[in-house]
């Protein structure tokens, strides 16, 4: 009598590279034993455009339109880091009004990013209603961006030494109205989602990351703060003028998908609180450092000709990056967004290294999904909040 062979073969499934809920093209090669995940291998690079190499062949001003294509849902942060690096390299002072305007734009961009994380994340786990609700606040936000910068997305608003244009007449009142309205929206989301038993069943205890583990993996942003680590670069690095306002670092200690949701939803309310304080105390004065508007160093340069009489509206085409190196970082919605810049007494950076939060946060995904169910992959991946534009660069 022959004994039947009861050996099981694992099933290998491709998720992607196009998944309907993904911002970009990520491919997951998942090994399954029935419904249980045995292994998961992310395949990156489908959206690689050589952003670091492009930077080495452009001046900072020429490169600014490119950076909004990294994380295209939080473009103000990529612009901020791009101008902060040469500002610190050249020791350029930013006027107080410009710094206040920057904080407003950064926090509005943080809210926009979290809103467009919340909708697809809820759709991933089966709740379609919030996906449509978030577009109300998002449309109002984009109207504010359009009025101030001329663009709904890809704003190209930050400049070395300030911002491109002052806030238009009546914009501050509109922004205050938006803050009052969106606070009620955040409360509505919390009522709709946070205590929903089906939602809690899907996210509670799923994808747990301990505090020490989060530090060892190099996680940042809500991924780190949801694991009990109170680390926010706005408090740590004291950049722009965040120290002048009263706000708290939002954190949770559970480290699961629910904790990451709670951190982001409370960060939206905290950002509104910061914006309200900035709008009430915004000072007068210039919106950019006029000393940055330099002409070409060469005598009788073509840049000084009659045809170029308006060139002083822009930072000089010969804005040199001194021969030194530095690392600059900001607290983006997804985590620590950093630039390692090496100058070479040239108008082009010698090296422009991008440290995207999404790329590093994504590395923990295979560990989180092991021994989980197949359906939990989208919950965990959604709670990480990645944009493939900045992951692949």
UniProtKB/Swiss-Prot annotation:
**In this entry, which stretches build a coiled coil?**
none
Catalysed transformations (reactions): a plastoquinone + NADH + (n+1) H(+)(in) = a plastoquinol + NAD(+) + n H(+)(out); a plastoquinone + NADPH + (n+1) H(+)(in) = a plastoquinol + NADP(+) + n H(+)(out)
Its name, as the record gives it, is NAD(P)H-quinone oxidoreductase subunit H, chloroplastic
Q: Which PANTHER family match?
A: NADH DEHYDROGENASE [UBIQUINONE] IRON-SULFUR PROTEIN 2, MITOCHONDRIAL (PTHR11993:SF10), NADH-UBIQUINONE OXIDOREDUCTASE 49 KDA SUBUNIT (PTHR11993)
Keyword NAD belongs to the record: yes
Q: What does this protein do?
A: NDH shuttles electrons from NAD(P)H:plastoquinone, via FMN and iron-sulfur (Fe-S) centers, to quinones in the photosynthetic chain and possibly in a chloroplast respiratory chain. The immediate electron acceptor for the enzyme in this species is believed to be plastoquinone. Couples the redox reaction to proton translocation, and thus conserves the redox energy in a proton gradient.
Q: Which PROSITE patterns match?
A: COMPLEX1_49K
Report keywords, A-Z. Answer: Chloroplast, Membrane, NAD, NADP, Plastid, Plastoquinone, Quinone, Thylakoid, Translocase, Transport
EC number(s)? 7.1.1.-
Which top EC class is given?
Answer: translocase
InterPro entries registered for this protein in UniProt: NADH_Q_OxRdtase_suD, NADH_UbQ_OxRdtase_49kDa_CS, NDH1_su_D/H, NiFe-Hase_large
Instruction: Give the membrane topology.
Output: Peripheral membrane protein
Protein localization: Plastid, Chloroplast thylakoid membrane
Question: Which Gene3D superfamilies does the UniProt entry name for this protein?
Answer: Cytochrome-c3 Hydrogenase, chain B
Quaternary state and interactors: NDH is composed of at least 16 different subunits, 5 of which are encoded in the nucleus.
Cited HAMAP family: NDH1_NuoD
